C-alpha cells in the first residue's frame, strides 16, 4: 500500500478515545483519499482529522513549522523519503516507519526522532497492521505526554539537519570522498552525505 494513510487515522481514533487533545492534519491526495475520508467518518474522528490537500513545497514547509510532530507511515516501497529531512529541518519530531530508506541514517530513536515498526506492505484499510498501529500510537502518545522531551527531540532533529546533513557538510564530504577515490583510499565518512547511506 506504500503510504499507509489508514495508520494515522486509526491512531487518531485510539488517541481520541484515550482523551488526548490534538489535531491530525493530512497533506496530499491520491488513490486512498476517498477511502481515508470514509474511514474518518466511520470512526467519528472528523473533529480531529483534517484533510488539507496538495500544496506547494514552500507552503508545506511553512505548515511543518506550525506543527510539532510529522508522521511518515510509508512502508519499504518509499525509497529514501526526502520529506524526512525536510520535516526534521523544520523542527518537527519525525515519527517514521523503520522501513523508510532514510530512517536508519537520519533518526536516532528517542533522540532526534521516533521510529515505529513498519506496517506490512500487504496490509489494507480492511486489514490494518495492529502491531504497527500500536507502536505508532504509543510513540505519539509518549510525545504528547512528555512535552519537554518532545521539545528536546525537535531541537536535536533540527541540529542533525543543520550540522550533519547540511549543504556545507555535503560539499565537504564530497571533496573528502573525491580525494579518497583519487588516491585509492577507502572513504572514512561514517555518517551524513557521501557516507554508505
State what each model feature region is.
Residues 93-97, 107:
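Short hydrophobic beta-strand element within catalytic cores of glycosyltransferases
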Residues 54-55, 62-67, 88:
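Short alpha-helical donor nucleotide-sugar binding micro-motif in glycosyltransferases
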Residues 135-142, 149-164:
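A short, well-ordered alpha-helix in the C-terminal region of glycosyltransferases
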Residues 61, 84-89, 103-105, 111:
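Short alpha-helical segment that forms part of, or immediately flanks, the ligand-binding pocket
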Residues 65-79, 92:
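Acidic donor-binding loop of glycosyltransferase active sites
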Residues 1-17, 31-38:
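A conserved mid-protein helix/loop that constitutes part of the nucleotide-sugar donor-binding site
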Residues 37-55:
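Nucleotide-activated donor-binding/catalytic signature segment of Leloir-type glycosyltransferases, i.e.
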Amino acid at each position: 500500500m506504500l503510504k499507509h494513510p489508514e495508520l494515522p487515522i486509526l491512531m487518531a481514533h485510539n488517541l481520541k478515545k484515550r482523551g488526548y487533545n490534538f489535531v491530525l492534519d493530512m497533506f496530499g491526495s491520491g488513490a486512498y483519499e476517498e477511502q481515508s475520508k470514509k474511514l474518518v467518518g466511520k470512526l467519528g474522528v472528523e473533529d480531529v482529522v483534517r484533510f488539507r490537500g496538495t500544496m506547494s513545497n514552500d507552503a508545506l514547509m511553512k505548515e511543518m513549522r506550525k506543527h510539532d510532530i510529522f508522521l511518515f507511515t510509508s512502508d519499504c516501497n518509499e525509497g529514501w523519503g526526502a520529506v524526512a529531512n525536510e520535516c526534521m529541518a523544520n523542527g518537527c519530531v519525525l515519527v517514521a516507519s523503520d522501513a523508510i530508506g532514510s530512517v536508519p541514517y537520519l533518526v536516532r530513536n528517542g533522540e532526534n526522532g521516533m521510529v515505529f515498526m513498519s506496517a506490512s506492505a500487504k496490509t489494507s484499510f480492511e486489514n490494518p497492521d495492529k502491531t504497527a498501529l500500536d507502536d505508532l500510537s504509543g510513540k505519539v502518545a509518549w510525545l504528547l505526554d512528555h512535552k519537554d522531551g518532545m521539545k528536546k527531540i525537535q531541537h536535536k532533529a533540527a541540529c542533525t539537519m543543520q550540522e550533519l546533513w547540511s549543504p556545507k557538510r555535503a560539499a565537504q564530504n564530497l571533496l573528502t570522498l573525491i580525494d579518497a577515490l583519487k588516491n585509492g583510499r577507502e572513504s572514512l565518512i561514517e555518517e551524513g552525505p557521501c557516507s554508505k547511506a
